[in-house]
Amino acid sequence: MVKIIAIDGPASVGKSTLAKKISKKFKAPVLYSGKLYRMLALEVIKRKINLNKTEEILRCIAYIDLDNLSSAELYSSEVDNISSIISAKKQVRNKLIAFQRSFPKKYGNNIKYVIIEGRDIGTVIFPKANYKIFLWAASEVRAKRRYNQLRKNGKNVSYSKIFSEINVRDRKDMTRKIAPLMPAANSVLLDTSYIDIEQVFNALKNIILKTKTV
């Protein structure tokens, strides 16, 4: 039976980078759930949808392109803010939750692991995941990472603005009524503030190799 590896954590903590490395090591497909919300947010922005019109937002789900996961547009501050707002809408979450839960089923028993990365994977989407990892890092560290990422993509951005936006995003994610950001009770917490991605990768790799299930 396919084992679920759930990787949760706040914005710019390194979830996607870690998921890619684990995917390569264990030949496991990855679903970046946060990018689903980002792609939906991008469609909402492009189509100038009123954020109070939930039905119109839901119709935008049909336009999500899973082949466009690496688009630089997904990492703009506007997309970041809009994705946080729409992810708090119950109807939107229910639609995308169903999509996420169906993802491992498409592989049957042909693979050993599936990686799902997001903010509520271990608490809501897959509460019985075999491995639950919660990544954390200080907000100033995450702001610097986001700043460097955007600069690499040719964006002219302000570190102080990004730092402020990350703190606002954290407050929204942690205090929202629906699926607030928090570690699952039985998750492994890894603070990435002062360790590099290789150290985080090795820690998770060892957990997977040495632990039967969580």
Language-model-detected regions and their locations in the chain:
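Phosphate-binding beta-loop-alpha motif at adenosine-nucleotide cofactor sites
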Residues: 131, 182-198
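Walker A/P-loop
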Residues: 16
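ATP-dependent small-molecule kinase phosphotransfer cores
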Residues: 35-112, 120-123, 140, 144, ...
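Hydrophobic anchor at the beta1->P-loop junction of P-loop NTPases
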Residues: 5-7
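Conserved AAA+ ATPase "sensor/coupling" helix adjacent to the nucleotide-binding pocket
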Residues: 148-153
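ATP-binding Walker
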Residues: 10-13
